[in-house]
């Protein structure tokens, strides 16, 4: 998946979360599924959850860049793959950025 400048990402309203020192856990209450998150995924999820109006791909890249040591190329590839996986699982929704 390539970064889409006109897309915003939102956490699904059916997902509940809790955080630990080294990650977190998501519960999709509609599907009855539980998912564990590492520290990076937990930071991404927390940012999605705290910004109900939605976040852009660049917002997520900046959150991780400011909190973890990682190369930009690797960072963008990993975040894109993570968002794609979350979208397939129905945990996030992608929509067009409001004009």
Segments (PLM) and residue ranges:
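Acidic, low-complexity/disordered tracts enriched in E/D and polar residues
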Residues: 1-42
